[in-house]
């Protein structure tokens, strides 16, 4: 199983209410995509730390992740929710199954 997490820095004009909307939209929209096994998203607790918003999604494999990336729901979510509100991102992928060679994730 692949755990994909993206950390985001937000544009200065993004309000706490907008962050709440982003969280709800992520859960409601991205869970419609068949390749998504689970999703978590949230806002930072400590305002002193960078990366005030994150989305984490589990996929069966990197192949499933690639299918997800091309899904029209994901493309629309990126265009309408993420791009207008974020200034920077950091994406990380992790293999969750012990003993599995990451070359075959």
Report each predicted region and the residues it spans.
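Glycine-rich beta-strand-turn "strand-cap" elements at beta-sheet edges
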Residues: 40-49, 79-105
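Generic structural "secondary-structure junction" signal
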Residues: 12, 35, 47, 70, ...
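Generic structural motif
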Residues: 11-13, 60-62, 97-99
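Short, conserved charged micro-motifs
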Residues: 14-20, 64-67
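Long, contiguous binding/interaction regions
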Residues: 18-23, 75
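Short, well-ordered beta-strand segments in beta-rich or mixed alpha/beta enzyme
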Residues: 3-9, 42-71
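An amphipathic, aromatic/His-enriched active-site/gating alpha helix that lines ligand/cofactor pockets
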Residues: 31-36, 58-92
């Amino acid at each position: 199983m692949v755990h994909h997490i993206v950390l985001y820095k937000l544009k200065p004009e993004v309000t706490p209410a907008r962050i709440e909307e982003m969280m709800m939209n992520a859960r409601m929209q991205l869970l419609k995509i068949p390749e998504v096994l689970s999703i978590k998203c949230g806002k930072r607790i400590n305002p002193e730390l960078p990366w005030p918003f994150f989305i984490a999604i589990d996929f069966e494999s990197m192949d499933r992740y690639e299918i997800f990336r091309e899904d029209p729901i994901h493309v629309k979510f990126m265009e309408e929710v993420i791009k207008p509100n974020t200034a920077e991102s950091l994406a990380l992928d992790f293999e969750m199954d012990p003993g599995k060679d990451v070359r075959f994730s």
